[in-house]
């Protein structure tokens, strides 16, 4: 016969086991939740575990800033820069300034306690130091494969902030514009890209930081430019005249970085440049210098760049 005391003891044991099971399940759920709240990001300097939907985000890369702006993602800290009109709101005082385009302010960054830091080429050497403050990813674009690199970076941002569907929608629309521009480029002859700075000129070709015109949009290069990496080839007016491009695209670096210097239009105002097919057919296009030199591969900015080239052809 089962006594009352034994029955009570058994009931207590069952309750204890049930409570233990619930606690274990809750703990497992907490672990799974914690695991789901982070993800591993492969980037230019390795792989980094980053939070999903980080609350406080700092970026030195204006292309990433432009992409996050296009996706309606809040950004809390940016470098002091000469922002183009499309990103001028980030120059406001309430947005934390985390240094310059090339030099991080480590004290300000540490004080802000960011959950994620995004960098690219200009501050790539500071990756290790920044990684000590917060998870840091390097979204530098690979100029040798700029389009796919840009897409991968954009998709990475989409995954971090759970905006994958919106990213694919915007990339799809952009790819349609690229195809339309390539059709125009097929019959547009050739082109040369020149940047002016301090009265000097540098040419950029396929595979360069501005190579989207050739590599992605399909305009034939007017010359084989010998520049390496981020740096183009120093050229003269005679070079431009001898190359004789059908289209000439011009970037004024002095305007982009906010320094005084002879305007690109004045630099190119000479008889040698005027003798080119580009000048004679009014096919010299002055590019938005901040957009092309400072921002580059951002989701909205690439759309603007593609539209500019499309209209020029």
Located regions from the model:
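Ligand-binding pocket segment of bilobal, Venus flytrap-like solute-binding proteins
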Residues: 196-198, 202, 229-257
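Extracytoplasmic substrate-binding proteins
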Residues: 129-198, 295-313
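Alpha-helical, coiled-coil/dimerization segments enriched in small aliphatic residues
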Residues: 83-86, 205-233, 289
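Proline-aspartate-enriched helix->loop->beta-strand connector
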Residues: 113-119, 135, 240, 244-248
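A short, structured surface patch at a secondary-structure boundary
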Residues: 56-111
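Short helix-initiation/N-cap motifs at beta->coil->alpha
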Residues: 43-45, 98-105, 227-236
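Structured C-terminal subdomain patch of bacterial secreted/periplasmic proteins
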Residues: 246-313
